[in-house]
Amino acid sequence: FKDRFKLIVVNNGEAINHPSGNGIIVINNENLGGSGGFMRGLIEAGKINDVKHVIFMDDDGSCEIESICRTHAFLLMAKDKNTVVTGCMLFEDNPAIIHESGAIWHRDFLHYPDKHYLDAREIDSLDTFDNERKIGYGGWWFFAFNINAIEYYSFPFFVRGDDLLFGYMHKKHNIVTL
C-alpha cells in the first residue's frame, strides 16, 4: 500500500529518531496533547498535494489494515464530500462488547454513546447494531474524512472533549459508523 497511503506519525513529546521515507512521515512535535498532534497532522497532510482523506487514530487504538482499505474505498465512492467514517470502540478485554458507536447530541448539549454495552454476539443485538442512527460525533480512535470538507480546526493543544468540539463544529457532516 505504500503507493496508495501515507502514514503521518506526529510524535508528541521526546523526539524519536526515525527517518521519513517510503510513505512514512515522522513529525516530532511539542507535547501538546492529542488535539495538538491531530491538528499538526492535519496541517501537514494538507500540504501534500495528493492527500484527500485522513484518518485520525489514537496511538493506543488498533484496527485491522483491511478496515483502513475499506474506509478508503468507501470515502472515494462517497458522493457527499462531508461523509465521515468513524469506527466503533470495543472493550479490549472483551471485544464483543461495544463501548461506543459514535455519539448522539441531546438538547442538554451532552453526548451519549450510541450502542453502549451492546453485545455483538447476541442475535437480538444485530438489528440494533445494523440500525444506523444519525450521530453527531465520532471519536478520534478512528475518524476518517475528506480534508477539503474541514472548515474549522480544533485547538492545537489538549482540551478535554476536543474531539467532541471538532464534531460539533462540523455537525453538517454525514457521519457513518462502519
State each model region's role.
Residues 7, 84-85, 175:
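Hydrophobic/aromatic residues located in beta-strands of well-ordered beta-sheets
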Residues 39-53:
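Active-site nucleotide-sugar/metal-binding loop of Leloir-type enzymes
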Residues 116-142:
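A recurrent flexible, glycine/aromatic-enriched loop bordering the glycosyltransferase active site
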Residues 20-36, 44:
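Conserved donor nucleotide-binding strand/loop of the catalytic core
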Residues 66-112:
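Conserved donor NDP-sugar-binding/catalytic core segment of glycosyltransferases
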Residues 136-142, 151-168, 173-177:
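Donor nucleotide-sugar recognition loop
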Residues 50-62:
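Short beta-strand-to-loop acidic/aromatic patch adjacent to the donor-nucleotide binding site
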Residues 1-27:
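Acidic donor-binding segment of Leloir-type glycosyltransferases
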